[in-house]
């Protein structure tokens, strides 16, 4: 039943029945571990691959000996964010240049650029922005066999040999039993051509090698080549059509394609997959031997003729150096050929080589050669070390190719297995480290070319390593990866869960992966091998569904990049579940029978049930306890972190659970975070691992606590200082604020939470608020999932969040002189400057609204030609003040708030600024947003809705004791959505609140319906959890009882303030001259084709005409209309829309001359702006262009022919109508324009 559990420094009442045998691992280990590997191993590997770089003549060689990263970054993480720089350290490489003619050696240390460092939280700071590198799920290198059926139902087998990089080999069969090969996606040739080219030139040799196979004979009949030379030339013609083929060039091409480690790379994982697939042990197990098999080293008979080969024997055969075994299948003798590798630790070696720690299988022929040539132990071990690259080759070998062909032929007889490419045994993760290593390799390959060229050009005696190496390509490759790769993403920082999930994300998209358009259903589907590795619930809705996933809670990634899941071993002899934990990849797991975590055990850890329900591959089976191999570690292991935070997940439909997981990531941090009453027990772990809380580094006593600093004196008398982040802006504009939760004099332990971050409450993740909800209708205000809330939530700031926006102003050098940040702004009243300091920068604490100046800035205007008199006056009285215009930074439309921080950077102070920028001011404006109508809220079960009305507290329905509800939800939102978890949460919440408990109900192992009913009865509630409610307006009881209780509700990032938008005039598109669209562009609302039909249907001709002309793209018409409105005159006739002129131009470009003719055959001239000056004409009066800046004063623009539309009296054209006019300077006596606001 319920038992108290300590979570951080809180106690929760847990309903868990299963004891956790394994601690959950560090949740961002994927990132950290991978990057650590890169710095320690990955870089070294790349340098080793590329060095030495030799000149074309071979007399110079450049080696990369060693590298080091300096350990002190120039700026701290926070400073990098402030200064827009990258958090990086310099990388120094030790380089040795050898002149082989003179024997001269020059060594020096070369700077190889700044290398971005990973922060403690597993992120990178690139140009001041925090970014995450997402792991990519790609197809693993290896050999894949698949089968199709032709139109007669005949089985055709095809194979693909995929390296990490290099040429693909593809085998395919046709209906006539001929086996073809494609090399590097070119035209196909019979497979025997490839065998001949590899040295098996005659038909007899080929049949001897692979056995008398029908398919082989058919292929040999089809094959026109008869010798190695002919075969090589045939292949060369396919690979290089149009080039004159020679045997030599064909040989070297084939060698370069497959057997050159620089061109063909299997990577460690490819070699592992090849050996696993092609090794004999997996292929001959459980088959009958056609001959007796003798151990070639000891002479011992392993298997008699006709005897079945057991798994153990198969492994022994493989590791004693036998590569070919003949087996009997339906009375036929079939040759099975391995790829000639053995496990060196199991091979009968004369010496002990376990000290070498070789995990991979090694090439037998090379191993034999070493053993034949060397006799004493030390020499053998040294030689093995030196020839490691040959023993475990990175490229494909002749043995591999023959083994793959043998496998293809064996499949006809049912020997071997078809591969499923969606199985996680065949897909692997490329994490940060590997992705970076690949980029670095590209950079170094470019560098290699440069070095080789410079070696030939420069004087041999003068050359130094420094002037050979140009680090640009390396730096560029790394910068390009971090800056613009699809996998380098701007971190989702809405709340701590969003951060954590982003770092654990797994994407099948990106370079070398799939594309959204090509990915079919199979790839996106949940696969049985995802169990315990990738969450079946958490994936985006929309085009990326199933292509982006999330790692499960206990998953980890092994050295080959395969995802492993943990299991407890079951001791089969006694039938006891042990506490030994085994991590297995998906293909290893396929061989075992695995029980679920919630299978009941007795006190001795033995299975209670006669039959245990287990998994075997995709089957669910019931077996006796003696057959079970493993057992799950925890019920949580199949879901991701976000999903495991949904209580009663087992009672929710998967589609809604998916929405619930995704919406928790969009919850906005509130002012007063509150941990859920009904949690799942994982909140603490998630908050701690997300890195937003502050943990004590050592045991000690708290000496000082301030809002922004905590000091702890440790046992050995040192003082640890912790500086807290106060009201910083996150990537998504939410507020990051840390608050101490310890007091002076408290004793703290190492690893204890001493400060809460955003959305955390005493070290637990707290994304929302516990509110009293009732499932009832109220006057139709909860129609279609709308939510009715009480004013109490607004008044108490329960759902209030702080949002911080950042605005930048830069003073640059222009052609006409430098811009200046100043308080002296032309045509601006003192009122607008009241909050600016003497530099023209707003003071901290000022309250600003849309249009207010944040930073005063002026830009020089173009000087007009001076008259002779003016020149004379200038000469006498000195320089007149330069003409300047106002380009101040203002608060954009619809924004307002309080200035919380101002940062000023200038060249004079030695700050690094972009070229051409002399000064930069950054202003942070914070807004306190209370919950309002139109905001989106959601529970954790995918139950989302928009707030429709905020009701006074006194009108809300109330409980018998007078407590008003805080939220009314629509009961119809439950049945069809099948997310019953929310109802159970509400019932349990009611009880928990009454008992004063905080509850943990873990997923798949939480409170049952019976538990809840028992508690309801114990707390004195009705067993159905329903309560009689009363109408707040009349005090009358409602007809029916209502389900009432506490639910955890989140306020999501879709806030109405960010979506409200209105425009009168604004920027226009350049070609069509129609208003832009979207809030970001300050655009208009699109009036599309169907809306036009609606107006046509009602015959609203004038409305329609003005929508299509003056409100859109009739350029001169809209200026005149604006003028007319401003002066209070009648609106003139509309002109011709610009888009019509564009159409005419397009028709003219097709050589069709188009004229517009009136009813009485008069041609209407289409005015065109051909003069250079007039390119931007009409907007000039409004001073509107795309950026919404004024460019040229109207007087210069309006020349002949454009003024005709204006009345005589306005000699002065409107000087300063901006596209958001607040004031006009039109000198017109009979019109006071002060109060116009359009």
UniProtKB/Swiss-Prot annotation:
Bias (Acidic residues) occurs at 1193-1238
* Reactions accelerated catalytically: RNA(n) + a ribonucleoside 5'-triphosphate = RNA(n+1) + diphosphate
Q: Name one GO molecular function term.
A: DNA binding
GO aspect biological process, one term: DNA-templated transcription
Q: Identify one Gene Ontology CC term for this UniProt entry.
A: DNA-directed RNA polymerase complex
Q: Which cysteines are joined by disulfide bonds?
A: none
Which Gene3D superfamilies does the entry mention?
2.40.50.100, 2.40.50.150, 3.90.1100.10, DNA-directed RNA polymerase, subunit 2, domain 6, RNA polymerase alpha subunit dimerisation domain, RNA polymerase Rpb2, domain 2
- E.C. numbers: 2.7.7.6
Keywords, in A-Z order: DNA-directed RNA polymerase, Nucleotidyltransferase, Transcription, Transferase
Annotated region (Disordered) at: 1186-1238
Which major enzyme category is it? transferase
InterPro entries, sorted = DNA-dir_RNA_pol_bsu_external_1, DNA-dir_RNA_pol_su2, DNA-dir_RNAP_su2_dom, DNA-dir_RNAP_su2_hyb_sf, RNA_pol_bsu_bac, RNA_pol_bsu_CS, RNA_pol_bsu_protrusion, RNA_pol_Rpb2_2
Question: What family does the entry list?
Answer: Belongs to the RNA polymerase beta chain family.
Role this protein plays? DNA-dependent RNA polymerase catalyzes the transcription of DNA into RNA using the four ribonucleoside triphosphates as substrates.
Q: How does it assemble?
A: The RNAP catalytic core consists of 2 alpha, 1 beta, 1 beta' and 1 omega subunit. When a sigma factor is associated with the core the holoenzyme is formed, which can initiate transcription.
Q: What is this protein called?
A: DNA-directed RNA polymerase subunit beta
């Amino acid at each position: 039943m319920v038992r108290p559990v300590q979570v951080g420094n809180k106690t929760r009442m847990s309903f868990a029945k299963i004891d956790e045998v394994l601690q959950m691992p560090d949740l961002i280990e994927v990132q950290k571990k991978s990057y650590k590997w890169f710095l320690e191993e990955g870089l070294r590997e790349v340098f080793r691959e590329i060095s030495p770089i030799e000149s074309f003549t071979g007399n110079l060689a450049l080696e990369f000996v060693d590298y080091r990263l300096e350990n002190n970054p120039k700026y701290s993480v926070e400073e990098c964010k402030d200064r827009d720089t990258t958090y990086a350290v310099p990388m120094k490489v030790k380089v040795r240049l050898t002149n082989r003619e003179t024997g001269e050696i020059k060594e020096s240390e070369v700077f190889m650029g700044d290398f971005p460092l990973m922060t403690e939280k597993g992120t990178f700071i690139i140009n001041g922005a925090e970014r995450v590198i997402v792991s990519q799920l790609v197809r693993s290198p290896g050999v894949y066999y698949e089968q199709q059926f032709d139109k007669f139902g005949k089985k055709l087998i095809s194979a693909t040999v995929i390296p990490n990089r290099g040429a693909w080999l593809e085998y395919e069969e046709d209906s006539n039993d001929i086996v073809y090969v494609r090399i590097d996606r070119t035209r196909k040739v019979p497979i025997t051509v490839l065998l001949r080219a590899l040295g098996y030139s005659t038909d007899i040799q080929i049949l001897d090698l692979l056995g008398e196979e029908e398919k082989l004979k058919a292929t040999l009949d089809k094959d026109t080549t008869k010798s190695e030379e002919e075969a090589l030339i045939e292949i060369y013609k396919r690979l290089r059509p149009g080039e004159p083929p020679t045997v030599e060039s064909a040989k070297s091409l084939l060698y370069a394609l497959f057997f050159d480690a620089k061109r063909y790379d299997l990577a460690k994982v490819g070699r592992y997959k090849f050996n696993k697939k092609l090794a004999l042990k997996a292929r001959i197990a459980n088959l009958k031997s056609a001959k007796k098999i003798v151990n070639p080293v000891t002479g011992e008979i392993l298997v008699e003729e006709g005897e079945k080969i057991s798994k153990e024997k198969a492994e022994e055969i493989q590791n004693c150096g036998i590569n070919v075994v003949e087996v009997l299948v339906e009375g036929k003798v079939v040759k099975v050929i391995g790829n000639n590798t053995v496990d060196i630790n199991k091979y009968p070696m004369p010496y002990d080589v376990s000290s070498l720690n070789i995990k991979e299988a090694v090439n037998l022929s090379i191993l034999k050669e070493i053993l034949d040539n060397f006799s004493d132990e030390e020499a053998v071990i040294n030689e093995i070390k030196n020839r490691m690259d040959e023993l475990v080759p990175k490229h494909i070998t002749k043995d591999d190719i023959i083994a793959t062909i043998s496998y293809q032929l064996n499949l006809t007889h049912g020997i071997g297995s078809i591969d499923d490419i969606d199985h996680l045994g065949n897909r692997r993760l490329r994490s940060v480290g590997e992705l970076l290593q690949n980029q670095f390799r590209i950079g170094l390959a470019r560098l290699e070319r440069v070095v080789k060229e410079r070696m030939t050009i420069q004087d041999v005696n003068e050359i130094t390593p420094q002037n050979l190496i140009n680090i640009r390509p390396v730096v560029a490759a790394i910068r390009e990866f971090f800056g613009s790769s699809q996998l380098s993403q701007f971190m989702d920082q809405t709340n701590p869960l969003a951060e954590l999930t982003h770092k654990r994300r797994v994407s099948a998209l990106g370079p070398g992966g799939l594309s959204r358009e090509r990915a079919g259903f199979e790839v996106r589907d949940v696969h049985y091998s995802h169990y315990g590795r990738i969450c079946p619930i958490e994936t985006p809705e929309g085009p990326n569904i199933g292509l982006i996933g999330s790692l499960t809670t206990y998953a980890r990634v092994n050295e080959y990049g395969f995802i492993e899941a943990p299991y407890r071993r079951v001791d089969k002899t006694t039938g006891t579940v042990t506490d030994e934990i085994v991590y297995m990849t998906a293909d290893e797991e396929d061989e075992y029978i695995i029980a679920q975590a919630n299978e009941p055990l007795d006190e001795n850890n033995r299975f209670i049930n006669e039959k245990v329900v287990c998994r075997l591959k995709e089957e669910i089976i019931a077996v006796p306890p003696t057959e079970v191999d493993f057992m799950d570690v925890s019920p949580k292991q199949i879901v991701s972190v976000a999903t495991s935070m949904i209580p009663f997940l087992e009672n929710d439909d998967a589609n809604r659970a998916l929405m619930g997981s995704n919406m928790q990531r969009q919850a906005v941090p509130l002012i007063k975070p509150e941990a859920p009453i009904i949690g799942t027990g994982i909140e603490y772990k998630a908050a701690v691992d997300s890195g937003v809380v502050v943990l004590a580094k050592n045991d000690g006593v708290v000496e000082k606590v301030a809002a922004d600093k905590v000091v702890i004196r440790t046992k050995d008398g040192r003082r640890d200082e912790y500086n807290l982040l106060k009201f910083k802006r996150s990537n998504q504009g939410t507020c990051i604020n840390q608050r101490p939760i310890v007091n002076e004099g408290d004793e703290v332990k190492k690893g204890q939470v001493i400060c809460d971050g955003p959305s955390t409450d005493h070290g637990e993740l707290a994304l929302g608020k516990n509110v009293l909800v009732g499932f009832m209708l109220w006057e139709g205000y909860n129609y279609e999932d709308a939510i009715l809330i009480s004013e109490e939530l607004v008044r108490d700031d329960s759902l209030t969040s702080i949002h911080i926006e950042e605005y930048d102003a830069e003073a640059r050098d222009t052609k006409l002189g430098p811009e200046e940040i100043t308080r002296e702004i032309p045509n601006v009243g003192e009122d607008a400057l009241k909050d600016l300091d003497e530099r023209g920068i707003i003071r901290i604490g000022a309250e600003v609204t849309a249009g207010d100046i944040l930073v005063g800035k002026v830009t020089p205007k173009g000087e007009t030609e001076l008259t002779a008199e003016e020149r004379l006056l200038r000469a006498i009285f000195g320089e007149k003040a330069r003409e300047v215009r106002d380009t101040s930074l203002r608060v954009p439309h619809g924004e307002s708030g309080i200035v919380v921080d101002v940062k000023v950077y200038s060249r004079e102070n030695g700050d690094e600024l972009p070229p051409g920028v002399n000064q930069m001011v950054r202003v942070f404006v914070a807004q306190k947003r209370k919950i309002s109508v139109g905001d989106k809220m959601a529970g954790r079960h995918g139950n989302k809705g928009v707030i429709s009305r905020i009701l006074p507290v006194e009108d809300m329905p109330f409980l018998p004791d007078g407590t008003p509800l805080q939220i009314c939800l629509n009961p119809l939102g439950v049945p069809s959505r099948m997310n019953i978890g929310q109802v159970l949460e509400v019932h349990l919440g009611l009880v928990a609140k009454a008992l004063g408990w905080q509850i943990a109900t873990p997923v798949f192992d939480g409170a049952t319906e019976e538990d809840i009913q028992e508690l309801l009865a114990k707390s004195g509630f009705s067993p159905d959890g329903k309560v009689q409610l009363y109408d707040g307006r009349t005090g009358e009881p409602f007809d029916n009882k209502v389900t009432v209780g506490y639910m955890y509700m989140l306020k999501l990032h879709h806030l109405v303030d960010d979506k409200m938008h209105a425009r009168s005039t604004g920027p226009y598109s350049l070609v069509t001259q129609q208003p832009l669209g979207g809030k970001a562009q300050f655009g208009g609302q699109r009036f599309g084709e169907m809306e036009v039909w609606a107006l046509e249907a009602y015959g609203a001709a004038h409305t329609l005409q003005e929508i299509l002309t003056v409100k859109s793209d009739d350029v001169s018409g809209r200026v005149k209309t604006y003028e007319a409105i401003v002066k209070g005159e009648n609106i003139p006739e509309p002109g011709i829309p610009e888009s019509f002129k564009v159409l005419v131009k397009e028709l003219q470009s097709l050589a069709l001359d188009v004229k517009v003719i009136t009813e009485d055959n008069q041609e209407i001239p289409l005015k065109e702006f051909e003069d250079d000056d007039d390119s931007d004409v009409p907007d000039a009066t409004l001073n509107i262009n795309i950026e919404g800046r004024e460019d040229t004063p109207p007087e210069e623009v309006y020349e002949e022919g454009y003024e005709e539309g204006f009345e005589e009296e306005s000699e002065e054209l409107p000087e300063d109508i901006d596209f958001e006019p607040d004031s006009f300077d039109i000198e017109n006596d009979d019109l006071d324009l002060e109060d116009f606001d359009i």
